[in-house]
């Protein structure tokens, strides 16, 4: 039993044993499925815990210049970075801190890819794609809702990809099950698999809550193994956030006044 009186208030308290249990499960999924699973900072960025994470995973994903710096300077490896848009001011620092950079549009890719080439460190570039399918019920949070500007739809993607696009990024889940991922993959492959021979990696984004008690991890592993079998040249990446720290701690507080 934790003695909460020993901690300041308010305070986030993480239980290392519970964190390691989640990390072991995630590493087991990654190893058995033959994929890479990385940490999304937008969900969790308690940097003092990063040495524990590094025992189980190698990389993280960033959505801003500061998260990219956190990846390099505290997590100890360069980030897989995606942002809806980059600026001339931030992009040099983004490049310094990133091994992968995903662009939200062809316009962004065309604007910044020459800088990647000139920088010369071998950053792998990708483009976000929109499968026009998501089971997120709240439209405000649905990245594939009508009129969304997140990613490129299949009709706007050329049959021959521009030189320099090495990967696709697809994110349309939120605390989702493996069965939602299965249905998403059906749409993703139907719309974009014609381009898969031209790319090296496929990032399936976050929202895969594989540490939830009712999550079917065996189905997830089978699903990812099947995807790898159909496209053996592709490096498959998942970047969950909440799954890593699901039910691993609490926020303590105290009542200081009652009117």
Label for each model-derived stretch:
Residues 23:
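Short amphipathic alpha-helical/adjacent loop interface patches that line ligand
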Residues 7-9, 136, 145, 250-253:
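Residue-level signal for pocket-adjacent positions within structured domains
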Residues 176-259:
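C-terminal active-site-proximal or functional interface alpha/beta core segments in diverse enzymes
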Residues 18:
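Active-site anion-handling motifs in enzyme catalytic cores
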């Amino acid at each position: 039993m934790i003695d909460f009186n020993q901690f300041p208030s308010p305070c986030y308290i993480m239980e290392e044993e519970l964190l390691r249990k989640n990390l072991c499960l995630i590493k087991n999924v990654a190893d058995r499925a033959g994929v890479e699973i990385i940490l999304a900072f937008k969900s969790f960025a308690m940097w003092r815990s990063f040495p524990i994470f590094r025992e189980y995973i190698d990389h993280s994903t960033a959505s801003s210049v500061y998260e990219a710096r956190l990846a390099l300077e505290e997590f100890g490896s360069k980030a897989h970075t995606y942002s809806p848009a980059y600026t001339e001011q931030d992009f040099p620092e983004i490049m310094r801190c990133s091994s992968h950079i995903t662009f939200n549009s062809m316009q962004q890719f065309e604007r910044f890819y020459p800088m990647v080439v000139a920088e010369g460190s071998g950053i792998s570039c990708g483009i976000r794609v929109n499968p026009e399918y998501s089971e997120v019920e709240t439209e405000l949070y649905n990245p594939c809702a009508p009129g969304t500007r997140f990613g490129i739809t299949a009709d706007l993607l050329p049959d021959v990809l521009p030189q320099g696009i090495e990967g696709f990024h697809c994110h349309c889940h939120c605390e989702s099950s493996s069965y939602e991922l299965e249905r998403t993959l059906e749409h993703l492959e139907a719309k974009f698999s014609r381009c898969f021979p031209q790319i090296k990696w496929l990032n399936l984004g976050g929202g895969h809550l594989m540490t939830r008690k009712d999550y079917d991890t065996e189905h997830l592993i089978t699903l990812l193994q099947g995807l790898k079998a159909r496209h053996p040249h592709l490096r498959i990446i998942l970047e969950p956030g909440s799954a890593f720290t699901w039910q691993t701690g609490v926020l303590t507080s105290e009542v200081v006044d009652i009117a």
